């Protein structure tokens, strides 16, 4: 037998017998294809035998050979397809088509072109069969007329073939190594290698085209021998299906017994829906009893040989009973509603046909049922819809509802648009209402802030800006008031407490920059010199400042704490409104002991008594220059800041600046009556002749003008 499989002559004989008769021998063709698929012959030898048979001059033999080749292509396996798609076979077909001597028969030519086209269409996407497509496109370009194309799936060329044999040094089941005594054997079903003990069974493999018993291993034998029981159960289930209502002859998968229950359920639902659609009335539908369904439910039961089928049927029957109960309840409720509506007055009865295009519950249920059936039919065999006339009737009844459904859909869309417009209007109204509430709330906050802010003096602020002098004239009137006994400005100073200004300046963002006067002092001093000549006597101080040639003069000098004109303006702004206001709570602050540098010696005795003695401990360096100024009342004021800037050490000046910054950043700034008289009150006296409303407090420093000039001449 091995020689019969190895030689090609028996195959040639079979091919001759298959192609010799005028009629096609389908059985012999399938036998040859099974022989090729089972690898009983080499695929290349089979291809060459067919090629030699095609060279026969008889057109009938050529047609029979082409049909045999097509059968082998569809059932011979992948290994034979590779040989058919080789250049050796395809070029032979092309040479037959282009034969110049004796022309090819038209029938043979048409069949050959049709087969080439079908093979090329089925082999699309497979690289190992790409030459089929190339040959097909080449013939198209050369002008050969192919028949019309037909939809061919790639599964046409798929066929089961024996697997390729796998080599190994040990048994792939018991892991025993092979030796001279322990020979290796291949399983024809899986292709693995086993020893004699693990592969002693033999079985025919018809699914691979092997009809003779061949060697298989124990695992494949167990799998293949267990199939007949499954096949028997499948046969029983197929008989059960044949006895059912469907009478379907189409082969179904293994899970068909579960799908059969769904088919019966769908069939019952179809019958119920059709009867309801036929028997429906204006007052709704009334479900009628269906005694004919009982035989349909009881017929499959005798044929159920398994418990699973019985359980499935019981579940289906329970679901059907529940469905019937729900439908009866719904019908009773619908009857009650319709009877109640009919017993009402005529206007109420006339309002019922208000919406004639509204779908009834029966129509809605039929539409949903039809959609469900269509979805399930997609997974059924193609001929199922033709065997179910009830589906066609349901389709026709639903098709008549299409205009009604379109009108109902249009009305629903119009209602939707109306509701959207109303929603937009409501959103606009709510937005306007929120805006109105926000405006009211903001106005309430503004009124609340007006009651607590420095509003009464706000009108006086614009009048103060043009009269701001330089920083050098800031403290000199205070010094003159002390030296020359002009106490007219000092009494209101404790009541005003101008040092409450730094917190306000800090709110406006001025304190941080006012603590560093040397950056703006050179520019602000000359800018206010002309005004200072006309108002008071600050020019000598400016000259003294210029003569010092120190970019950072002694901060301990009273005239240099607020040197920049840009920072004096806010001081003036907040100073005058507080002249008329009672500032008594700002006086007793203990912060005055920290930064009043010139209180102990440079001021009258009354303010000194009000302050604690801690001030003298903190500013001893400042008390001495103040004493010198009190003793030298006839000296010019221009020499005072220069003297402090020269004689005070740089460390003391830095300490004084730090103390000034701390006092300006503190929350109090309230207890500086004496320090403020040294800085702000006299400074306001220099400027007040032009802009300040209270003239009494600021016109007094004008008296010592000649004295200052005389003292400058004496210096």
UniProtKB/Swiss-Prot annotation:
Zinc-finger ranges (FYVE-type): 165-225
Keywords: Endosome, Membrane, Metal-binding, Repeat, Zinc, Zinc-finger
Membrane protein topology class: Peripheral membrane protein
Gene3D superfamilies: 1.20.5.1940, 1.25.40.90, 6.10.140.100, Zinc/RING finger domain, C3HC4 (zinc finger) (3.30.40.10)
GO MF annotation list: phosphatidylinositol-3-phosphate binding; ubiquitin binding; zinc ion binding
Domain VHS: residue ranges: 16-147
Stored SUPFAM superfamilies: ENTH/VHS domain (SSF48464), FYVE/PHD zinc finger (SSF57903)
Gene Ontology cellular-component terms listed: endosome membrane; ESCRT-0 complex
Region (Disordered) residue spans: 275-310, 335-355, 481-715
Gene Ontology BP annotations: protein targeting to vacuole; protein transport to vacuole involved in ubiquitin-dependent protein catabolic process via the multivesicular body sorting pathway
Residue spans of biased composition, Low complexity class: 291-302, 650-662, 697-706
CDD domains: FYVE_spVPS27p_like, GAT_Vps27, VHS_Vps27
Subcellular location(s) per record: Endosome membrane
Residue spans of biased composition, Polar residues class: 510-551, 589-609, 627-647, 663-680
SMART domains: FYVE, UIM, VHS
Ranges of residues in domain UIM: 261-280, 307-326
PANTHER family named in the record: VACUOLAR PROTEIN SORTING-ASSOCIATED PROTEIN 27
Family, per entry: Belongs to the VPS27 family.
Function of the molecule: Component of the ESCRT-0 complex which is the sorting receptor for ubiquitinated cargo proteins at the multivesicular body (MVB) and recruits ESCRT-I to the MVB outer membrane.
Description of its domains: The FYVE domain is involved in the binding to phosphatidylinositol 3-phosphate (PtdIns(3)P) which is required for the association to endosomal membranes. Both IUM domains are necessary for efficient binding to ubiquitin.
Subunit record text: Component of the ESCRT-0 complex composed of HSE1 and VPS27.
Record's protein name: Vacuolar protein sorting-associated protein 27
